[in-house]
Swiss-Prot record:
Its main location: cytoplasm. Belongs to the GPI family. Pfam families: PGI. One of its GO terms (biological process) is gluconeogenesis. This is Glucose-6-phosphate isomerase. The gene is pgi. PANTHER family: GLUCOSE-6-PHOSPHATE ISOMERASE. It is found in: Cytoplasm. It is an enzyme of class 5 (isomerase). Disulfide bonds: none annotated. Catalyzes the reversible isomerization of glucose-6-phosphate to fructose-6-phosphate.
Length: 540
């Protein structure tokens, strides 16, 4: 039986046909919204976070059926298997134990191993932060450069930026990911090799982009006067392949381990987060883990009807598989969370952008939606026009931090007001009759342009304050949401075979770009023409 033939899926399809034309404006009308109100019935909390799902195109019956689908699809079974360390990544024969990295129960899988490596990280981070760790000329470290890509970059970069207000002012952290030399070169202009520590992060330590940047940075250190014998003072590695790290030239004692039972996009809780720990300190890193662990416990223990990751995930299923939404927007009204949308792009689309079910049969229903976003209020002046008046319905997750992490507190009411007002405007809209009044009797032709359809669905997540703990809970919420949706779609969220083919062909094309001659029949006519054009340019 395929997922979309489950009884609850069929019930949801019937239910969708029944309510698809209903307008939330009518549901919120006082005469239709007696106590307990929608705002009360669709308010949930967990892991220190609060959620308002009331401005979604759902009823009590919708949530009941969505939870029923989650049960029928085996969400609980898959969740429990993941926490237990079972092989939930069958295509690679691996567990997915990112939750073990923040577990506090000594009975958790790999507990002693995780604690030992974290203690090594903490000792090293303290040395760097205190100034005890010195470069080859005896100066303290003032710059940390994290070189990695994908999960080795997006998570740490997002967290370091989000917790900037908690970071030591003595150290500036830079992130380099792109193989475009401009990325590394721009950072080189801002650092002093005598005061720089490079953290090279790669699960295999063979990743093209990471190793290209790592070699260039190592060469730059030597060119600037660092003896090769002193590079150990400036380079550390994080990898599941320690032998390859040592082969690169990093001292064995400077290698921090990650494990193959942790996927890259779930790895910021491990030594991949060393740049985070150096920036904010071991104590705050521990708070980050504690917040994630709190959400883990909520995900494990809360009934599905009140389970934040389950509800967030199933509401996403509702729009993707029944309304046919192609994308969804993440709009954090927090500049500190600037990089959260790009982090979630990888988490959601690399995890669930799949077409093959666990049994190898192709799905006949949509899976991951396009994830995108920008912090508020910037997005309001870029793409909110489309959200309000375009023909496409895009579900939105608003994220609001209720208290500021900076001293410019007078800005904050304006920020929150915009967030809440956008959710209200998207829900209510503006009718043609209302638009005519706004246009005025002298410009009736303007009225159609002032109509807002409304009925645009939004969820609002509330964070009391942006702390390491609350950030950890927020990240874990989305991690578990991904698992919930993968369970419903019957796909594997822990592999990423889709990135492999381009890598393989990329090596062939790279060789052709620099070879003395090229067999034009090796590639299609378009690719051959692109290679020829590039070869001519590179020879100039």
């Amino acid at each position: 039986m395929t997922q979309n033939s489950l009884p609850s899926w069929s019930s949801l399809q019937t239910h969708y046909e029944k309510i698809r034309d209903a307008h939330m404006r009518d549901w919120f009308a006082p005469e239709n919204d007696p106590a307990p109100t929608r705002a009360e019935r669709f308010a949930f909390a967990g892991g220190g976070l609060a959620a308002d799902f009331s401005k979604n195109r759902i009823t009590d019956e919708t949530l009941k059926l969505l939870v029923q689908l989650a049960r029928e699809a085996g969400v609980e079974k898959r969740r429990d298997a993941m926490f237990a360390g079972a092989v939930v990544n069958p295509t690679e024969g691996r567990a997915a134990l990112h939750t073990a990295l923040r577990a506090t129960d000594p009975k958790a899988p790999f507990y002693d191993q995780v604690q030992a490596e974290r203690a090594r990280m903490a000792a090293f981070a303290d040395q760097v932060r205190s100034g005890e760790w010195k470069g080859y000329t005896g100066k303290r470290i003032r710059y940390v450069v994290n070189i990695g890509i994908g999960g080795s970059d997006l998570g740490p970069k997002m967290v370091v930026h989000a917790l900037h207000h908690l970071a030591t002012p003595e150290i500036t952290t830079h992130f380099v990911s792109n193989v475009d030399g401009a990325d590394l070169y721009n950072v080189m202009q801002q650092i002093d090799p005598e005061e720089t520590l490079a953290i090279i992060v790669s699960k295999t330590f063979t990743t093209l982009e990471t190793m290209t940047n790592a070699r260039s940075l190592r060469d730059w250190f030597v060119e600037k006067g660092c003896p090769e014998s002193a590079l150990a003072k400036h380079f550390v590695g994080v990898s599941a392949n320690p032998a390859e790290v040592v082969k690169f030239g990093i001292a064995k004692e400077n290698v921090f381990e990650m494990w193959d039972w942790v996927g890259g996009r779930y790895s910021l809780w491990s030594a991949v987060g060393l740049s985070i720990m150096i920036a904010v300190g071991p104590q705050q890193f521990g708070e980050l883990l504690a917040g994630a662990n709190e959400m883990d416990q909520h995900f494990r223990d809360a009934p599905l009807e009140k389970n934040l990751p389950v509800l967030l995930g199933m509401i996403g299923i509702w729009y993707r598989n029944f309304f046919g939404s192609q994308s969804y927007l993440v709009a954090p009204y927090s500049e500190a969370l600037h990089f959260l949308p790009s982090y979630l792009q990888q988490l959601e689309m690399e995890s669930n952008g799949k077409s093959a079910r666990l049994d190898g049969v192709m799905v006949d229903y949509p899976t991951a939606a396009v994830t995108w976003g920008e912090p508020g209020t910037n997005g309001q002046h870029a793409f909110f026009q489309m959200l309000h008046q375009g023909p496409t319905i895009v579900p939105i997750d608003f994220i609001a931090v209720l208290t500021p992490e900076h001293p410019l507190v007078s800005h904050h009411p304006k920020l929150l007001a915009n967030c809440f007002a956008q959710s209200e405007a998207l829900m209510l809209g503006r009718t043609l009759e209302e638009a005519k009044k706004v246009a005025g009797a002298d410009k009736p032709e303007l009225a159609p342009h002032l109509v807002f359809p409304g009925n645009r669905p939004t969820s609002t997540l509330l964070v009391d304050a942006l702390t390491a703990r609350s950030l950890g809970a927020l990240i874990a919420l989305y991690e578990h949401k991904v698992l919930v949706q993968a369970s419903v779609w019957d796909i594997n969220p822990f592999d990423q075979w889709g990135v492999e083919l381009g890598k393989i062909l990329g090596k062939v094309v790279e060789a052709d770009l620099t070879a003395p001659s090229v067999d034009e029949k090796k590639h299609d006519s378009s690719t051959s023409a692109l290679i020829a054009r590039a070869r001519a340019a590179l020879k100039k």
